[in-house]
Amino acid sequence: MGKRKANHIISGMNAASAQGQGTGYNEEFANEPLTPAERQNNKKRKKNQ
């Protein structure tokens, strides 16, 4: 099998800039409102980073 290109990298852009901070697991849903449960989890995770 050939090497698969990472999905979150937008072709045509600088590869390095596409992989910086902020390209997290939930990047596609970044502008959706969080549920109260998710907000709690977010706070916990922030502390651990």
Curated annotation (Swiss-Prot):
GO biological process, any: asexual sporulation
Subcellular location: Spore core
Inducers of expression: Expressed only in the forespore compartment of sporulating cells.
Protein family: Belongs to the SspO family.
Protein's recorded name: Small, acid-soluble spore protein O
CC per GO annotation: endospore-forming forespore
Presence of the UniProt keyword Oxidoreductase in the record: no
Keywords from the UniProt entry: Sporulation
Source species of the chain: Bacillus mycoides (strain KBAB4)
InterPro entries: SASP_SspO (IPR012613)
Annotated stretches, region: Disordered: 1-49
Primary location class: other
